[in-house]
Amino acid sequence: MNRPERLQPGVKLRDADKVARIPVKIMPSERETMLRKPDWLRVKLPASNQRITEIKQALRSNGLHSVCEEASCPNLAECFNHGTATFMILGAICTRRCPFCDVAHGRPLKPDADEPVKLAKTIRDMKLKYVVITSVDRDDLRDGGAQHFADCIREIRALNPHIQIETLVPDFRGRIDVALDILSTNPPDVFNHNLETAPAHYRKARPGANYQWSLDLLKRFKERHPNIPTKSGLMMGLGETNEEIIQVLKDLRAHDVNMLTLGQYLQPSKFHLPVERYVSPQEFDELKVIAEDLGFSHAACGPLVRSSYHADLQAQGKEVK
């Protein structure tokens, strides 16, 4: 068996080059076998692109990244036009290679020590009141990137004292306690970590991750910060059943998670995992009722819902779908 070529620092691997490095073989999807996208997934583009252009220019001029662009989010136009963005720190190259995700895999560069200040200034200039900070996985760092998260939160609050900050963190594999110790110095207003799918589908969808580790991360943060909401998100369409998703919801509540996002998986390219089903808006509505009955303080459930989609409205308890 031929070994993959050694990764070069800063080189992005995408699509076929990325998924070739996972343990489950994925055959490229043929157009005739791909499920037809239903009408309810058609995204309406805004009348004006001015605000979108302004946000993209602000990101470029400061050398910053948004997960909206890097992960090819279908809501990019709506969110940018609304004046919101989810900032992705620690670079745009992930040490993991999840085949549902469009973020590039590779060997990341050293973290930018100036990024926390640049991020804080950009948020101030954009006059944002609620921000979501996420990152790629950084298994190459001894703390998984936790100190960089804490530094960003500190600098953002220094320049934006009235802002609310939500962090969407990786799983800090093997470093949970170290990471939580560091994050305790500057905790966010909402702590988010996505389980993504049911445990039976982790090997194909989240190679390198562990379902129980992710639950433990959410639980341990809540134990340290009982008054800070915890949140998690799931995708549907990766081969799971509704019954499996309901069990995940029960597991999340058993680990004291307060907020939920549930959305439709969309295949970024023919080289990624195929969509195995499109879940109807009615099914999402039914799952929302179940989530609320289980005790989630807020559940955003709908085909185009993503973990940071209208996160400010989610935090206010307003309906998002």
UniProtKB/Swiss-Prot annotation:
Catalytic reactions of this protein: [[Fe-S] cluster scaffold protein carrying a second [4Fe-4S](2+) cluster] + N(6)-octanoyl-L-lysyl-[protein] + 2 oxidized [2Fe-2S]-[ferredoxin] + 2 S-adenosyl-L-methionine + 4 H(+) = [[Fe-S] cluster scaffold protein] + N(6)-[(R)-dihydrolipoyl]-L-lysyl-[protein] + 4 Fe(3+) + 2 hydrogen sulfide + 2 5'-deoxyadenosine + 2 L-methionine + 2 reduced [2Fe-2S]-[ferredoxin]
Residue numbers binding [4Fe-4S] cluster 1: 68, 73, 79, 308
The protein's annotated pathway: Protein modification; protein lipoylation via endogenous pathway; protein N(6)-(lipoyl)lysine from octanoyl-[acyl-carrier-protein]: step 2/2
Record's keyword annotation contains DNA-binding: no
UniProt remark on cofactor binding: Binds 2 [4Fe-4S] clusters per subunit. One cluster is coordinated with 3 cysteines and an exchangeable S-adenosyl-L-methionine.
GO CC, any one term: cytoplasm
Bilayer-crossing regions: none
Known cofactor(s): [4Fe-4S] cluster
Matches recorded under PROSITE patterns: RADICAL_SAM
Main location: cytoplasm
Chain sites annotated for binding [4Fe-4S] cluster 2: 94, 98, 101
InterPro entries the UniProt entry points to: Aldolase_TIM, Elp3/MiaA/NifB-like_rSAM, LIAS_N, Lipoyl_synth, rSAM
Compartment(s) of residence: Cytoplasm
EC number(s) stated in the UniProt entry for this protein: 2.8.1.8
UniProt keywords, alphabetically: 4Fe-4S, Cytoplasm, Iron, Iron-sulfur, Metal-binding, S-adenosyl-L-methionine, Transferase
Domain Radical SAM core: 80-297
Gene Ontology molecular-function annotations: 4 iron, 4 sulfur cluster binding; lipoate synthase activity; metal ion binding
Keyword Metal-binding: yes
Pfam families in the record: LIAS_N, Radical_SAM
Similarity comment: family membership: Belongs to the radical SAM superfamily. Lipoyl synthase family.
Protein name: Lipoyl synthase
Origin species: Shewanella amazonensis (strain ATCC BAA-1098 / SB2B)
Taxonomic lineage: Bacteria, Pseudomonadati, Pseudomonadota, Gammaproteobacteria, Alteromonadales
